[in-house]
Amino acid sequence: MRFPVWTLVICASAVLIFNSPELRTLLIYDRAAITHGELWRLVTGNLVHLSNTHLAYDLVAFLIAGTIIEIRCYRFFPTLCLSAAILIGIILYGVEPGMYFYAGLSGVVTAAITYLCLHGLTEKGMWRWLCAAMLAGVIAKIGIELMLDQSFLLSVGTEEFVPVPLSHLIGTVTAILLFLMSLSASLEHPKNAL
């Protein structure tokens, strides 16, 4: 069993940034600032949160998924988080020219949950079935969000912020790609199993 270092570092960073207006201003995804060369915002915007509710939703889900991933020693978790953050920022910048600001960890959270579920599908017993059900839920949630063009949580009236369903899809695709690459590597080199 491993201590969830990366999970706690990412959560602590999000809390620190939330409690510092200066850091929020410096790190939020801001299209105009990115266009003028502040490229770090493509990644760091994922750590910025705009309300207590926004932060709480993301932290609870990330703490649970990340802790389980790290305790179960599923490999490449830091790579997953960084890859998802980078791809979310770059893709949103490329395909959402009308989006001037973006903040939140939900796309990375979705990547973590998807990654956890995919690993769980390789195991036996009840855990496998629980992961299959969670993965089906993630896919259904993203489908609903994309059809309604809003977050599932917003459709039940509980959000104070504007969600970006595309970030959840990007997170899921990132998790699937990294999982398949790690699976392929473990098949080529059995000593480096997942």
Where are the model-predicted features located?
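Alpha-helical transmembrane segments of multipass membrane proteins
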Residues: 15, 66-67, 89-94, 116, ...
